[in-house]
């Protein structure tokens, strides 16, 4: 069925209804918190948000106990991965009283273009792609820009490596060679037959990771293989579009048996870059960094200007044509006000 396109007024009405519902839920939560704080609460302790359910979160204490908690009204928006201070209640429901500083946060624009955190304290972004649906360098580069902008180490992961055959091997190899040449860590695995899964486990050990990538690349299947017994509801590729059906619904943090954590967040079909500037995009292309600021003109657009350091590097072979094309495509997709 074709996607329904809403008018601006319809979108506004939907947002208004959602805001009113959220406000009513917040008032109910505020009353619940007041009732809890009026009773007996335990001492303050630190914990980590391992799941978010709108107006409530699940918090794991230092000893591994998990509790459902209400949120104080004066708290900033919490996301999975946040470290918090909380107090346990006498009926199994606690209260979050403070958010501890974040070491990092992964953000993306919401439907209105406002920046919204989706995970906190992540130190590794695993960018998952697969032979099917067909991988596109432009989408991978968008994720890399987001990772560089957030200061989070990326790991490129080709899943479904068992689907590489004579029909797609040449294109897949060419794509992988681009990122190997740039020095990005890259692993080829198969959640289906277990290929290189131990190598992946070793790369994830000791890190807080989040998997990103378009639907259908097998993120949930990877989670199920890495964490046996954890069901994240795997969806099949759509027979009509060839794209994946979105199945994971709630961001949740899992512990790997050998150490390290995984935040499994809802599938993202295409990661938006509305929150970054032209300078951020340029900085996200790591091979540009030593060249930026060396053009003849300070306002160089790296298009056809004489004395452009990037164009000279492209001519000399220090910048790959695929990467320059991807850079230009990403800039063309951004609002002109961000240039």
Curated annotation (Swiss-Prot):
Role, per record: One of several proteins that assist in the late maturation steps of the functional core of the 30S ribosomal subunit. Helps release RbfA from mature subunits. May play a role in the assembly of ribosomal proteins into the subunit. Circularly permuted GTPase that catalyzes slow GTP hydrolysis, GTPase activity is stimulated by the 30S ribosomal subunit.
Family according to the record: Belongs to the TRAFAC class YlqF/YawG GTPase family. RsgA subfamily.
GO cellular component: cytoplasm
Co-factor remark: Binds 1 zinc ion per subunit.
NCBIfam families: PRK12288.1, ribosome small subunit-dependent GTPase A
Binding site residues for Zn(2+): 295, 300, 302, 308
Uppermost EC category: hydrolase
GO MF annotations, alphabetized: GTP binding; GTPase activity; metal ion binding; rRNA binding
Entry's Gene Ontology BP terms: ribosomal small subunit biogenesis
Source organism of this protein record: Pseudomonas aeruginosa (strain ATCC 15692 / DSM 22644 / CIP 104116 / JCM 14847 / LMG 12228 / 1C / PRS 101 / PAO1)
Disulfide links within the chain: none
Cofactor(s) demanded: Zn(2+)
Protein name: Small ribosomal subunit biogenesis GTPase RsgA
Chief localization: cytoplasm
InterPro entries the record matches: G_CP_dom (IPR030378), NA-bd_OB-fold (IPR012340), P-loop_NTPase (IPR027417), Ribosome_biogen_GTPase_RsgA (IPR004881), RsgA_GTPase_dom (IPR010914)
Stretches assigned to the CP-type G domain: 111-271
Positions that bind GTP: 159-162, 213-221
Cellular localization per UniProt: Cytoplasm
Keyword Zinc-finger annotated: no
EC number: 3.6.1.-
Source domain of life: Bacteria
Alphabetic keyword roster: Cytoplasm, GTP-binding, Hydrolase, Metal-binding, Nucleotide-binding, Ribosome biogenesis, RNA-binding, rRNA-binding, Zinc
């Amino acid at each position: 069925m074709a996607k329904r396109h809403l008018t601006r007024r319809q979108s506004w009405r939907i947002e208004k209804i959602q805001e009113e519902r959220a406000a009513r839920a917040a008032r109910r939560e505020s009353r619940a918190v007041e009732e809890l704080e009026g009773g007996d609460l335990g001492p303050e302790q630190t914990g980590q948000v391992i799941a978010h359910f709108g107006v409530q979160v699940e918090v794991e204490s230092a000893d591994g106990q998990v509790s459902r908690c209400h949120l104080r009204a004066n708290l900033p928006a919490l996301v999975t991965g946040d470290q918090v201070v909380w107090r346990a209640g006498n009926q199994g429901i606690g209260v979050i009283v403070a958010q501890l500083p974040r070491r990092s946060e992964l953000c993306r624009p919401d439907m209105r273009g406002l920046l919204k955190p989706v995970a906190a304290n992540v130190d590794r972004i695993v960018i998952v792609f697969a032979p099917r649906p067909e991988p596109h360098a432009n989408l991978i580069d968008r994720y890399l820009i987001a990772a560089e902008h957030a200061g989070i180490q990326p790991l490129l992961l080709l899943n479904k490596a068992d689907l590489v055959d004579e029909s797609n091997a040449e294109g897949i190899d060419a794509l992988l060679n681009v990122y190997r040449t740039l020095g990005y860590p890259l692993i080829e695995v198969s959640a289906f037959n277990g290929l290189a899964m131990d190598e992946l486990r070793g790369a994830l050990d000791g890190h807080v990771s989040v998997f990103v990538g378009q639907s259908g690349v097998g993120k949930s299947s990877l989670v199920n293989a890495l964490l046996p017994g954890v069901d994240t509801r795997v969806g099949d590729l759509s027979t009509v579009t060839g794209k994946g059906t979105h199945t994971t619904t709630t961001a949740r943090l899992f512990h790997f048996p050998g150490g390290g954590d995984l935040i499994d967040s809802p599938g993202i079909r295409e990661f938006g870059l509305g929150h970054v500037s032209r300078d951020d995009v340029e900085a996200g292309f790591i091979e540009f960094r030593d060249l930026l600021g060396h053009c003849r003109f300070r306002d160089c657009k790296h298009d056809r200007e004489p004395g452009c350091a990037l164009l000279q590097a492209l001519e000399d072979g220090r910048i790959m044509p695929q990467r320059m094309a991807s850079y230009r495509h990403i800039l063309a997709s951004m609002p002109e006000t961000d240039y």
